[in-house]
């Protein structure tokens, strides 16, 4: 058939539990899950929020004065980018020939304490394509993670189409979602934690993570006419034991919290496979990018179905850092030396003939 051919592939949303705050063991577990996903034909494999080394559930469950040990363990097992763990993850993607997306806690190379909630995307060749830091840590997460920037809030061209990603609550942020759609996003990745406890057991107004994931995921797929690959982490007994440390109150809160969910949705917001609610497993579905074309006829909010003469979104993708260096240090030093030489020359030229005989009248630089 004549004309363009668009990507058609199989996606896998992995819902798995990490080995709590054990970076190396969790990467090994990730490799096993990628093998399972590849065995069923997956070409895009997605893992949940801060899968490596774990999601900081303790932020919601303990007072800040009781969180220091958790914070240190998280930092010690976080990932520095670039670094050996990034090379490992790239190697896993390359060996299996998949596009790999994984949530990590990233630590800074300068500060012994700065961490970010980050999503990494690797190409089939193992190259790191994108490192997106969550723009704003949500609620209690502010006790752990720093703000990200928009330097990597972008869509990547991959073997499975134009790929964008947002982390957890960012999928509530209309402007962040539109920024990806406006860059031509075809496949969206949304990642979530294993649980989100906001109330003690029995509260009938507690935040329902399962419903929140379902509503946001369908909304973005429908509004943007994109496919949405949604992956959450799973909550296992080891994590509950490690976080609760024998505290029955904390155990009760975690056991009663609404579970996470993983799913794959089409451009009408429809599930393409049975969602996975709670527990571990893989959601697998076939994605045909061309199916978005018909839906775009009805509502194309980054095309004809908008008024850009009325609405305007500005995206600042400049990286943010602790310090901005203007110029090269060596060049700056030479500039100072040249300025001093010029100043000295001018001082010498101001010495009159009669002053030459009286050193007390010499300019200081000449006298020295």
What kind of feature is each model-predicted range?
Residues 12, 120-122, 263, 283:
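Conserved hydrophobic/aromatic positions in well-ordered beta-strands
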Residues 138-154, 169-175:
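Active-site glycine-rich loop that binds ribose-phosphate moieties when present
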Residues 125, 130-132, 275:
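Short hydrophobic alpha-helix segments
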Residues 227-228, 232-368:
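C-terminal beta-strand edge segments of enzyme domains
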Residues 8-20, 118, 131-133, 161-170, ...:
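Active-site-proximal beta-strand elements of phosphoester/diester hydrolases
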Residues 23, 35-124, 194-219, 223-226:
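Cys-nucleophile CN-hydrolase/nitrilase-fold catalytic domain and related Cys-dependent amidase chemistry
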Residues 79-101, 162, 168-283, 367:
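CN hydrolase (nitrilase-like) catalytic-core segments centered on the catalytic cysteine
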Residues 1-44:
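N-terminal active-site segment of His-dependent metallophosphoesterases
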